[in-house]
Swiss-Prot record:
GO cellular component: cytoplasm
Main location: cytoplasm
Record-given protein name: Elongation factor G
Pfam families: EF-G_D2, EFG_C, EFG_III, EFG_IV, GTP_EFTU
NCBIfam families cross-referenced by the UniProt entry: EF-G (TIGR00484), PRK12740.1-5 (NF009381), small_GTP (TIGR00231)
């Protein structure tokens, strides 16, 4: 099967929005107008279109897929292939948001015409900024009371520090909104209400809007000629670019993230969606318009580039794992280079395992389709992968590459969770395991002593969302305990311990003597073991028992029973008995030896230190810094980003609980923060005593 659409005719994009800006409705309308079986502009039987729309309205097209493939005929009459990638609504799910931003090539940022740029819009915008994602803006909900397009344009400049290039002006607002002025063609599009937005009339610009349209067209041209020297010179000499040239310049500036074309409409009332789709074709990049993806060559560890080309070796990134009621576990992957055939084996370079591609699906808005082959630029859902998790690279086994070394930080916060009814116990276990498979930064374990189920994640909000998803998706109601910080323990000085284990009580006895030097591991936080035994003081076959014994007690330190980090143990001497010694005897001896030594080797409590980034308007910088200092935070630096200030700090996790509420009230909801685990550091002694007293009582 040959490629159906050229790669330059692909658009992989997402819709970014504040939770209430109308993302679902806009996506639904896009899927409706681009629906595979009902291309607007082709099957133009109003009645059929109406029926389908009503049916879909009753059922509500819910986009349960992480990526939906659909098609659209551009202004030039040529079909394009769209892959719409779902970007999560929860911005605090940093890992997931950033991953979806990674696999899309461009985005539409939605604004609510009534609210303009809201705090969460700022957050999503800044994340897209970090990945340099080309964006267009759609000012939605123009029919809402209080809708104000021009105020939204102003807020983009003041709140986001971005340049919006206005491409359309609204005709009317609130309940009077009926169409838009196209500033390139200089005509007006007015939608017919009776066709549910499927049809519109191209008319002259209303007389009372002609001056405004001229003014905004002038601004549009002024902005776009700046990116092209020849066009700029011609413009200064009085020669205006023609419409095709304007579009070409808007496209270049958008892809280079110099500015953002802005459109308006109301998805709910079906007005303005088709021109937005034409704009996706005209202004957002295809996979070959953006820099080729870089990866690490598994063999040489050097950096390599994989171009978006079917003839390059296969490379793809698994960006989402979802459970599908019909197919089971589906792995969504973006193919960056090469092509993939059903039934072939691919290499998972992160897990170093081969995977066989069983079924390969293309997801459409209201159907799924089995496909035999997929190409560079495609987004596919793969069934039957056993080892692959989010963030893994799948590639040609002969040309291995790792596209992204996903560093999933260790969870830093944990809470006990239990189902509200005994009958939900099993359902809760299944739900938690599925959620853990989808999100590598979330873990589930059982506390051996209390038998409680413990969930661990990247922060309070992360775990709140998990509990919320359990309720919504798996219908399991759960109660949660208070959050607990994942402390650790270590040793701070060298200590030599000599220990003999003897047991004589009839029958075979036990005997083992070990002499071990314990010290902080200079190599880092892992456990290191070395044997310097010479002359057979401890026979070779017993040495693994010594290591195993120490490892078995590392999970519970001497101060408050927390796992231990950064310990090195060197076995230097020992003794054995021909009859009474065994691997088990040496295991017991080394276990007791370490327990004794840990108390004498300067045991110390460690706490997780978080890397906190706060993005705030300038007015609140003083308050934010003062507050972080009061939380034992250390400010690492600050910089301006657009009209906002970014403050970086290291703060102990124990002092970050409920921070989100404080920050919101301090900044009237305009500042936001992200928090990632950075490192472990010693707990100040006064705080350490409190923690020890609290936890020793529990152990």
């Amino acid at each position: 099967m040959a490629r159906e659409y050229k790669i330059e005719d692909y658009r992989n994009f997402g819709i970014m929005a504040h939770i209430d800006a109308g993302k679902t409705t806009t996506t639904e309308r896009i899927l409706y107008y681009t629906g595979k079986s009902h291309k607007i502009g082709e099957v133009h039987d109003g009645a059929a279109t109406m029926d389908w729309m009503e049916q879909e309205q009753e059922r509500g097209i819910t986009i349960t897929s992480a990526a939906t493939t659909t098609f659209w005929k551009g202004r030039d009459g040529k079909m394009r292939r769209f892959n719409i990638i779902d970007t999560p609504g929860h911005v605090d799910f940093t890992i997931e948001v950033e991953r979806s931003l990674r696999v899309l090539d461009g985005a539409i940022a939605l604004l609510d015409a009534n609210a303009g740029v809201e705090p969460q819009t700022e957050t999503v915008w800044r994340q897209a900024e970090k990945y340099n994602v080309p964006r267009m803006i759609f000012c939605n909900k123009m029919d809402k009371t209080g809708a104000d397009f021009y105020r939204s344009v102003e807020m983009i400049k003041t709140r986001l520090g971005a340049t919006a290039v206005v491409m359309q002006l609204p005709i009317g607002a609130e309940s009077e909104f009926k169409g838009v002025v196209d500033l390139i063609e200089m005509n007006a599009l007015v939608w017919r209400d009776e066709s549910l937005g499927a049809q519109w009339d191209v008319v002259e610009i209303p007389a009372d809007m002609k001056d405004k349209a001229e003014e905004y067209r002038e601004k549009l041209i002024e902005t776009v000629v700046e990116i092209d020297e020849a066009a700029m010179e011609a413009y200064l000499e009085g020669t205006y670019p023609d419409n095709d040239k304007i579009r070409e310049l808007v496209r270049r500036g958008t892809i280079d993230v110099k500015f953002h074309p802005m459109f308006c409409g109301t998805a709910f009332k079906n007005k303005g969606v088709q021109p937005l789709l034409d704009a996706v074709v005209d202004y957002l990049p295809s996979p070959i318009d953006i820099p080729a993806i870089k990866g690490i060559d598994v063999k040489t560890e050097g950096e390599i580039t994989r171009k978006a080309d079917d003839n390059e070796p296969l490379s793809m990134l698994a960006f989402k794992i979802m459970n599908d009621p019909f197919v089971g576990s589906l792995t969504f992957a973006r193919i960056y280079s090469g092509k993939l055939e059903k039934g072939t084996s691919v290499m998972n370079t992160v897990k170093e395992k081969r995977e066989r591609v069983g079924r390969m699906l293309q997801m459409h808005s209201n159907s799924r389709e089995d496909i035999e082959e997929a190409f560079a630029g495609d987004i596919v859902a793969l069934a039957g992968l056993k080892e692959t998790t989010t963030g893994d690279t799948l590639c040609d086994p002969l040309k291995p590459v790792i596209l992204e070394r996903m560093e999933f930080p260790e969870p830093v916060i944990q809470i006990a969770i239990e189902p509200k009814t005994k009958g939900d116990q099993e359902k809760m276990g299944l739900a938690l395991n599925r959620l853990a498979a989808e999100d590598p930064s979330f873990r589930v374990k059982t506390d051996e002593e209390s038998g409680q189920t413990i969930i661990a994640g990247m922060g309070e909000l992360h775990l709140d969302i998990i509990v919320d998803r359990m309720r919504r998706e798996f219908k399991v109601e759960a109660s949660v305990g208070a959050p607990q910080v994942a402390y650790r323990e270590t040793i701070t000085r060298q200590h030599e311990e000599d220990y003999t284990h003897k047991k004589q009580s009839g029958g075979t006895g036990q005997f083992a003597r070990v002499k071990i030097v314990f010290e902080p591991n200079p190599e880092g936080e892992d456990f290191a073991f070395e044997s310097k035994i010479v002359g057979g003081a401890v026979p070779k076959e017993y040495i693994p028992g010594v290591q195993k014994g120490i490892e078995s007690v590392l999970s519970s330190g001497p101060l408050a029973g927390f796992p231990m980090l950064g310990v090195k143990a060197t076995l230097i001497d020992g003794a054995f008995h021909d009859v009474d010694s065994s691997v088990l005897a040496f295991e017991i001896a080394s276990r007791a030896c370490f327990r004794e030594a840990a108390k004498k080797a300067g045991a110390q409590l460690l706490e997780p230190i978080m890397k906190v980034e706060v993005v705030t308007p300038e007015d609140y910088v003083g308050d934010v810094i003062g507050d972080l200092n009061s939380r034992r935070g250390q400010i690492q630096g600050q910089e301006s980003r657009g009209v906002a200030v970014v403050i970086n700090a290291h703060v102990p996790l124990a002092n970050m609980f409920k921070y989100v509420d404080n920050l919101r009230s301090m900044s009237q909801g305009r500042a936001q923060y992200t928090m990632l685990f950075d490192h472990y550091a010693p707990v100040p002694s006064n705080v350490a005593q409190e923690i020890q007293a609290k936890y020793s009582g529990q152990k």
